[in-house]
């Protein structure tokens, strides 16, 4: 994500110069959002390591929409939880749980570490929600989406990249590793978040984070098509519920 942040800055440099004065008016929000963005992957991956991939994934992904709508209700004028959002959220969370736990196995993690992992999962969801809410707020106040994300990712990268000194020992050890890093930086972290920022121009942060529940569905589809894995019936049921969740979100939009 740190390398992807530099890519975001490079792509948005012209727009950043254009919106520089507007950005300066939101220094506090940008700082909070950059810290949240940098902390998100650290909390997310640590949660999966300590609590298990299934539990860490479910908590991190499922709590982000909840925290996002909570931030909107507390700090954004005229925003409230709608029945449509609540229904979509409930269906989506049920789908995520079925999909992820359909292939999970019993964990042998020490209980105290597992609790820490669960807590980190909640923190990851909160960090992602903070980033999304701040980005949406900046866009609503006249900052272009490309500038908002470029600035947030740029400052986030300055915080995140030094962690490579501790965690990135083998990151560039082989050609394969370098290609994977390049792909992750350019496609998911670069183009993916550009698309996410563009979407924030038209939907709320809570709706955008809810739509990202589609991410595990794509991962499951790639696992079947590319890797040749099989998904149990319970997992397919979860995918169906997630698709229903998305249909509820886009209905009448």
Task: Show where each model-derived region lies.
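Hydrophobic alpha-helical transmembrane segments of multi-pass integral membrane proteins
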Residues: 1-10, 86-94, 115-123, 134-187
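Transmembrane alpha-helices of multi-pass small-molecule transport proteins
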Residues: 1-39, 65-71, 127-131, 149-167, ...
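Glycine-/small-residue-enriched transmembrane alpha-helix faces in small-molecule transporters
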Residues: 4, 34-35, 39-43, 107-137
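Hydrophobic transmembrane alpha-helices of multi-pass small-molecule transport proteins
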Residues: 5-8, 81-103, 213, 222, ...
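Specific transmembrane alpha-helical segments of multi-pass solute transporters/efflux pumps
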Residues: 12-56, 60, 98, 185-203
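Juxtamembrane helix-entry segments on the extracytoplasmic side of multipass membrane proteins
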Residues: 22-26, 101-127, 165-183, 230-240
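Hydrophobic/aromatic residues within transmembrane alpha-helices
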Residues: 47, 74-77, 138, 148, ...
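Helix-helix packing/entry segments at the starts of transmembrane helices
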Residues: 56-63, 134-157, 189-225
């Amino acid at each position: 994500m740190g390398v992807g942040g530099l890519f975001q800055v490079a792509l948005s440099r012209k727009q950043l110069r254009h919106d520089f004065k507007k950005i300066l008016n939101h220094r506090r929000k940008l700082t909070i959002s950059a810290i949240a963005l940098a902390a998100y992957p650290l909390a997310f991956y640590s949660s999966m390591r300590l609590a298990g991939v299934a539990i860490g994934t479910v908590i991190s992904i499922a709590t982000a929409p909840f925290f996002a709508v909570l931030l909107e209700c507390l700090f954004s004028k005229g925003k409230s939880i709608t029945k449509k959002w609540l229904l979509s959220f409930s269906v989506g969370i049920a789908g995520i749980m079925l999909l992820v736990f359909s292939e999970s196995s019993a964990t042998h993690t020490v209980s105290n570490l597992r609790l820490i992992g669960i807590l980190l999962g909640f923190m990851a969801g909160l960090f992602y929600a903070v980033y999304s809410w701040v980005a949406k707020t900046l866009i609503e106040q006249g900052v272009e989406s490309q500038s908002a994300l470029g600035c947030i990712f740029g400052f986030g990268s300055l915080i995140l990249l030094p962690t490579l000194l501790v965690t990135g020992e083998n990151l560039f050890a082989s050609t394969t590793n370098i290609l994977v890093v390049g792909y992750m930086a350019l496609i998911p972290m670069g183009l993916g978040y550009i698309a996410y920022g563009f979407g924030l121009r038209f939907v709320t942060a809570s709706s955008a984070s809810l739509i990202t529940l589609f991410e595990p569905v794509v991962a499951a589809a790639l696992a079947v098509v590319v890797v040749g894995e099989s998904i149990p019936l319970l997992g397919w049921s979860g995918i169906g519920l997630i698709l229903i969740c998305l249909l509820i979100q886009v209905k009448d939009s």
